Amino acid sequence: MSCFHEEQRFGRWVWAVLVIISVPVVVAAIGVAGRDPAALAAILVGPIVVAVITALFAVAKLVTDVDDRGVHVSFHLLWPTRHIPLEDVQRAHATEYSPLVDYGGWGVRLSWKGWAFNTGGAEGVLVETKSGKRIMIGSRRANELEAAIAKAIAARSA
């Protein structure tokens, strides 16, 4: 039984970044292809890669669930589900953070602070395990996520 469920997608800022990156790639490919038509197939690799990455971001979503077994975090199509058993949770608390400064960006990140799963925003729940691992879960409903984890742990202990 799930006591918390949240789905998040990347915001408009991702699309702006992808457009900023893709326009020069496409323009460069067209410019080079105009000078050497035989190289067209090789040159199209750049725009195709950009299109595939854009498509992945379009369908990718961060899904967070809390149930009687634990916390489950997944980036559909981009990363396998991360399962954190309730018995491994030492502490979970809602907090503000900077995805770029604290974890080096958005998506699935590993930094000296631990793992992060986020699509944007500056709020999340930091889950600290009994083994010392730290997992930041970005959430637009951080207080609800924190409460759901606490409730699931309490229900398991009862």
Please identify what each model-predicted range represents:
Residues 1, 63, 124:
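A residue-level signal for beta-strand positions that form part of recognition/binding surfaces
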Residues 46, 50, 68-69, 106, ...:
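Generic signal for short, ordered secondary-structure residues
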Residues 19-26, 46-54:
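Hydrophobic alpha-helical transmembrane segments of multipass integral membrane proteins
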Residues 49-91:
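Conserved beta-hairpin
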Residues 74-140:
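Non-transmembrane, membrane-adjacent beta-strand/coil modules in membrane-associated proteins
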Residues 36-48:
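Hydrophobic alpha-helical transmembrane segments
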Residues 1-37, 116-117, 131-134, 140-147, ...:
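N-terminal membrane-targeting/pre-transmembrane regions
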